[in-house]
């Protein structure tokens, strides 16, 4: 393990890259998918189960944790790693995205954002300085600077104004973060779908200097084609020798397309949220376990999968426990989905290292186009 934060790039194939992010709590193999532990837990999963899926790092949510149980309480109890029993790296978001999503419950100024809690209506203020303090109290390994993320579509003037505010907040975040060996601060590029604004944002962030860089403001309603158009150029504005993180993505084909365009890290609630609602990701696309076609099917969700749900249980059983609203349904389907997402990441890492990413991508899309296996 490294005592400092660093990033080693091991191989590339086209724009796709593979390497390792080194932290005092262990390495993160890239490209990496980060399961989301919103309130200090990946819903329906034990920490050791999350690790067993192949995850090297989790994401925690500053907004939710600052409200309940509070960052100060987590700090008194030994920090987020001890609190949730996860001894690997943790990345925390800044809270900005969730606060900006509150719409009528928040007020935006140059200083920061004041908002009302969705839990009890209490009033709070989140600024770049307060966000850095909260993430320090949590003990995050990777800290995200505070930013504003406008929903798309939005007009150019609104996007430009928002991006420049985020860049001023990035400078304040950098200053408030200070020098913390072993911990990293990532800047967040904004600019919507405007190439020149993305470049301006990247230049502003590079002039400040960060340990890694995120592409923010995507997967917020613009659609996959527009997102990929932006990713065709945006990662190229960022330093080659630093990790690149696409926030809030996503679906399996979004993940593969992002890695193809030079992204190293991603996060999304999709695999865990979908598991709780009966949506299952497999090599042959998405299936809905509540459908009656699975009622008498003795086969696993995916015959090539080695997760506990596929090794030990039939579609018929998983259909039954889902329809019966048994808690084990959420546990098994979430485990399967997270395992599948990590298998995608491992497949891409191996393909990039071997110079066969294009062939791997073609096989990935062919499998999904094939569709789920026919019912018995």
UniProtKB/Swiss-Prot annotation:
Q: Provide the GO biological process annotations.
A: queuosine biosynthetic process; tRNA wobble guanine modification; tRNA-guanine transglycosylation
Q: Which reaction does it catalyse?
A: 7-aminomethyl-7-carbaguanine + guanosine(34) in tRNA = 7-aminomethyl-7-carbaguanosine(34) in tRNA + guanine
Q: What is its EC number?
A: 2.4.2.29
- Protein name as catalogued: Queuine tRNA-ribosyltransferase
Q: What function is annotated for this protein?
A: Catalyzes the base-exchange of a guanine (G) residue with the queuine precursor 7-aminomethyl-7-deazaguanine (PreQ1) at position 34 (anticodon wobble position) in tRNAs with GU(N) anticodons (tRNA-Asp, -Asn, -His and -Tyr). Catalysis occurs through a double-displacement mechanism. The nucleophile active site attacks the C1' of nucleotide 34 to detach the guanine base from the RNA, forming a covalent enzyme-RNA intermediate. The proton acceptor active site deprotonates the incoming PreQ1, allowing a nucleophilic attack on the C1' of the ribose to form the product.
Matching SUPFAM superfamilies: tRNA-guanine transglycosylase (SSF51713)
List GO terms (cellular component aspect). Answer: cytosol
Q: Which GO terms describe its molecular function?
A: metal ion binding; tRNA-guanosine(34) queuine transglycosylase activity
Needed cofactors: Zn(2+)
* Pathway, per record: tRNA modification; tRNA-queuosine biosynthesis
Lineage summary:
Bacteria, Pseudomonadati, Pseudomonadota, Alphaproteobacteria, Rhodobacterales
Q: List ligand-binding residues for Zn(2+).
A: 305, 307, 310, 336
Keyword vocabulary terms for this entry:
Glycosyltransferase, Metal-binding, Queuosine biosynthesis, Transferase, tRNA processing, Zinc
Source species: Ruegeria pomeroyi (strain ATCC 700808 / DSM 15171 / DSS-3) (Silicibacter pomeroyi)
Which residues hold substrate?
A: 93-97, 147, 190, 217
What Pfam families does the annotation carry?
Answer: TGT
